[in-house]
Amino acid sequence: MFHGTITKELTSHEEWSHYNENIVEDQKDFVFVKYNGLHLKSMENLQSCISLRVCIFSNNFVTDIQPLQGCKKLIKLDLHGNQIKTLPDRTFWNGLKNLKLLYLHDNGFAKLKNICVLSGCVNLVGLTMFDCPVSLKKGYRHVLVNSIWPLKALDHHVISDEEIIQNWHLPERFKTFSQSLFFNICPAPIKGTTYEDEIKNIKHIISRINEILAHNSPVLIIQRWIRGFIVRKHLSPYFTRKRHHDRMIRVLETKLICIGRNNEDKFLEDIFLIKPESNIKGKVAHWKQMRYSPDDFKYSTEYRKHISCLSYELKTKDIAGNSKQPRHHIQKGQNEMKSDSEDEEVDTKFRISAMKIPLCPSRSLKYRAMLKEIKWDYFPEYLQPLPATRQKPQVKRETHEELKERRNFLASQRAGMDLHLFNDIDKYYSEQRQQEEEARKFAATAAAQVAQERARLNTSENLRKKISMARKLMQKDNETIQKGLRHIWKERLNYLEKVRERKSMFLAEKKLNAADQSLVLSLNNERSILLRGIIQVDKLKRDLSEMKAKHFDVIEKREKRKYKQNLLTEMKKLRAEEIHKRHCEERFVIDTLIFQKGCERLEEAKAKVEFINTYYTSKSHKKYHNKTMLNHI
């Protein structure tokens, strides 16, 4: 719109009134305005921008910001690089309740009293006023920090607790102008930024300020500790409540097998119910999961009497490999189960799908290496029991051809001889053979029962010896562990003493370094102030020289322009005179030509008259001829 300016003639004209009303209606919806470096002198065009949130009006010639009073939704206001010397009153700043970032550096503020009106901004987080005359005053930062309460960052440093709390001396990390509190609150502007980019930049700046305060403000750190303590104290009944560790019981259908482990007179058992008849290769049975608490272990001893125990090292066979039957001990309560399964054939191709044994406690892991060396397991290996009943003798059946031959022999020889005597002899020998077989089997079963009893006694004795040996090993291990712990504690105490000595030396060096650093910082600050003044003086000199050069250039241009105008006027005069001369010469030539033609005609007429006078004699004819000649002339 006319490069951002509208003249009074256009605004007052009747044809432009409707256009101006549309402009005002559009300005009410403006959210983001950026006039950077346009050499503008007033902000009157922003009076109707009610919805304005981000206003960048930097590097101009603005002196009054009162037109922004209607922009009550401002979040960011950038007015640096202008010629503002006074700020509006407190009512102006009370209306800007959403203002969080205010950039006023590089302006002409000179009085602290005028700046204190910024305390009306209830949500102001960041403020910049460096490169202003007021920033060179002694109590500039102290007055601003303690008058604008919500302020968190001033110029290039976040506000420390040392500036707020009087006579509080803090370490170097938390002091004013420390390196940890440095933050570039006004980054370099980027061309082509949109409203979304500016909002993201505002959020980033505020979050960065809060992060620096959270890590470098002792008050906030202590508050965080106290809040954590209160929350933990409030939630401690929920964390200290004892929970029973659930155990998993996996259930399949028919037979009970217990996998148990003895660890310092404590039994932890996982109970499985399996199908011994299942002949499945490489398939996992369907388990039903049940939970039980440690209170259920009270009945484990009674329940253990009625189930069979397996070894800890049950090895399942591979899918295509040979299977090994686990060795287990059959107790008295299993006679009924044993009698039911006597006549069934044992299938050697079954696979037990077992759950993993729960992890051993940390104390039992100490004996793992020793147990590997002596190749001893926690659980005994029991012998495979022999069946209590004898097996049926195998009956040899005759083939069809043998039966046919015997029938033919009996049919042919029956009529010739009596076979009753031979039948009695065969019956006697068969009964005698059967009695011998039964006596041999009875002796074998008696020997097997004796061997089984001897094996049971041997296993119980081996178990007792292994338990006593394990207890002795545990006592020795406890003694060695206690010695090792004492040695470790001594080493730790020596290490802590060395660390304390190093810490004291480090703190002393740190104090010296802090003093040196503070001296260097003070010198750098003084040097930076001096350099800034020198740069400003050089800048003023440069500006004056540039202004003088521009002034001389303007004067030269004016003289050249006047000289050109004089030349043009003289050239016009000369050209007019030349044109007049040419016109006169042409007029003279034309007049001479006309006169010559008239003379020629007169002489021709005279010649004709003489001719007539000489050749025509009659007077009438002469008169008529004279009239015609005169008319012709």
Swiss-Prot record:
A Pfam family annotated for this chain is: LRR_4
Positions of the LRR repeats?
A: 51-72, 73-94, 98-119
Chain intervals for the UniProt region annotation (Disordered): 322-343
Annotated keywords: Coiled coil, Leucine-rich repeat, Repeat
Output the InterPro entries linked to this UniProt entry. Answer: Leu-rich_rpt, Leu-rich_rpt_4, Leu-rich_rpt_typical-subtyp, LRR-IQ_domain_protein, LRR_dom_sf
Question: Residues in domain LRRCT?
Answer: 132-179
Specify the domain of life of the species encoding this protein.
Eukaryota
Under SMART domains, the record lists: LRR_TYP (SM00369)
Q: Where is the IQ domain positioned along the sequence?
A: 215-244
Looking up PROSITE patterns in the UniProt record yields: IQ (PS50096), LRR (PS51450)
Coiled coil: which residue ranges? 556-616
What's the protein name? Leucine-rich repeat and IQ domain-containing protein 3
Q: Which gene encodes it?
A: Lrriq3
